């Protein structure tokens, strides 16, 4: 998130140096929501009290989903550079687009589907396992779309393992996956966990390729 802010600040500096927008200088108000949906809404409300006219963010999926709903009530333009859940910009239940929300990245369905296509069609794998964090919109979204697409192509998902936020030991899940004999493992998780998962996979003898 800090990298995103640094780039926003650089862009702001460049825009203001070139006269701003419609002759007006821009100002960024930044608050840390700590990756929490409730805290994100609290920060948004505080920023509205300070007179913001547009929202850039959030960075990750769960708080962005909360902000998408909240910003709609204010009819405030919102753009995210990195939140990938389809529901950020589209409500599948009502088949409506969230007209005030925009994104500058791909979606969970796109990522999960394309990775399944790559694994099955390009790499030739027919048996896959998945390990992902449960209760996390981003991780679950990618896992679900990968599984559905891989099976629709004719592949077999031999195992799906989950872990909880804050876990640091994945050996039990990885040992279970090893016993199911996959040719490849899909690991749609954040880099902090992925590094540990890969190291522990090696320690239990799970030597198949990981995709993520």
Named regions from a protein language model:
Residues 1-5:
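Short, small-residue-biased leader/transition segments that mark boundaries at the very start
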Residues 6-28, 151-156:
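Signal peptide-proximal N-terminal region
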Residues 25-49, 111-114, 161-177:
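Structural motif
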Residues 33-38, 54, 60-65, 83-89, ...:
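Solvent-exposed loop/turn segments at secondary-structure junctions
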Residues 47-59, 77-81, 129-133, 181-191, ...:
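Periplasmic-binding protein-like
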Residues 76-102:
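Flexible loop/hinge segments that line or gate small-molecule binding clefts
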Residues 96-165, 184:
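An alpha-beta-alpha
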Residues 142-212:
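Extracellular/periplasmic bilobed ligand-binding domains
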